[in-house]
From Swiss-Prot:
Coiled coil feature spans: none
Protein's UniProt keywords contain Transmembrane helix: no
Pfam families for this protein: SRP54, SRP54_N, SRP_SPB
GO MF: 7S RNA binding; ATP hydrolysis activity; GTP binding; GTPase activity
Subunit: Part of the signal recognition particle protein translocation system, which is composed of SRP and FtsY. SRP is a ribonucleoprotein composed of Ffh and a 4.5S RNA molecule.
Annotated localization: Cytoplasm
Organism whose genome encodes this protein: Buchnera aphidicola subsp. Schizaphis graminum (strain Sg)
Gene from which this protein is expressed: ffh
Protein name (record): Signal recognition particle protein
Cross-referenced InterPro entries: AAA+_ATPase, P-loop_NTPase, Signal_recog_part_SRP54_M_sf, Signal_recog_particl_SRP54_hlx, Signal_recog_particle_SRP54_M, SRP, SRP/SRP_N, SRP54
Record's comment describing the protein's domains: Composed of three domains: the N-terminal N domain, which is responsible for interactions with the ribosome, the central G domain, which binds GTP, and the C-terminal M domain, which binds the RNA and the signal sequence of the RNC.
Residues engaged in binding GTP: 107-114, 190-194, 248-251
Signal peptide interval: none
Domain of life: Bacteria
Amino acid sequence: MFNNLTERLSQSLRKIINKGRLTEENIKDTIREVRKALLEADVTLSVIKKFIQNVSKKAIGHEINKSLTPGQEFIKIVKNELILSMGEKNHDLNLSIQPPAIILVVGLQGVGKTTTLVKLAKWIKEKYKKKILTVSTDIYRAAAIKQLQILSDQVKIDFYLSDTTQTPINITKEAIEHAKLKLYDLLLIDTAGRLHINTEMMNEINTIQNISKPIETLLIVDSMMGQDAINIAKKFSASLSISGIVITKTDSDARSGVALSIRHITGKPIKFIGTGEKLHQLEPFHPERIADRILGMNQVISLIKDIEEKVNQSQVKNLTKKFRKGDDFNLNDFLIQLKEMKNMGNLNYFIEKFSKNKILSNNPLLGENKNTLNRIEAIIYSMTHKERMHPIIIKGSRKRRIALGSGTKIQDVNKLLKNFDNIKKIMKKIKKGGIGKMIRNISNILPKNF
């Protein structure tokens, strides 16, 4: 969803990155290119106008942070405005109420409403350890009730079986009573969608909302609908008390205008985004992380977070110690980390995250599959202990011997050594000035083909 905007903004901001100072003249072309990028992303015109005005005002005559170049400062201003457009901070679910807390899920037909409800139930169950019940009030769409039942069963969440001969109002009342009787912490109510908004639909949802008194009413919108999604959200917000928005299908090729516009237009926070079809692919919406993603900065941070969830804490601590001791990190340590990566199970998931980053996508250490890591392992195993501890001694004849012993080419050995050296440089930056300083200087550390 954000890839096209990332590409366009990267092209626009590249022109200003090395400027000695920010002036109205030298940012004019960049501002124009940023505006075009936002238009192509289908961002609402009123949002673009405000965005460009704020960036221009803050950039010209802005006091530059001494640790940043003017170009970096401009990118920081753009990032901050992206965050402001999307809502500044993450808005968590409000579950602080006497059980059962009720979440009402609304939206048009075909936006992924039922699937999103189950994803949300799964996420809440795993994070908060709640006892959860789901129910469908959609008596109009064929197999809607059965769909929710099947999906709920897949994630081992209880389902209240309703009947198409009942009214949505009666189903709601009965499900609430059942949730109270069986001491459920949370009840998620799926409502009927329509192909378009109409008075009958809104009246029904309003009645369900008045009866159930939900602590959250979440509007589900499809990112692929573009400006139509914005208009639909506006109409729902005018008719219902919406507490938040969930944007689905953000893994698609849809333009990113919905995410950048919907908060400004509706005044309602984006609470979650759907990142794929599978039932675990739902993420809390963090404006700062999305801004980093749009500007191409988030892959490393996101990968570290995912790795922390995959490995045990002792492994994380050991990795962190080595990571901070840049001078002590050698090819033996690197080999251990390669083995851990291979043992994580879902290696392709991590590689995919890196492959989306323009800076890192050409890195031979992040090959296409496990075979690449096997090849790197073979190169390191063909080295002597001394060579692994002190890679600097590996010159012409040693490289030929290592390539021959590992069944690879000298170029492969050169690439491994070059990229290992880059990793050590990054670690030294972290050791000296912390991660923040390393990120600010990352463009000076990495070669263009890294």
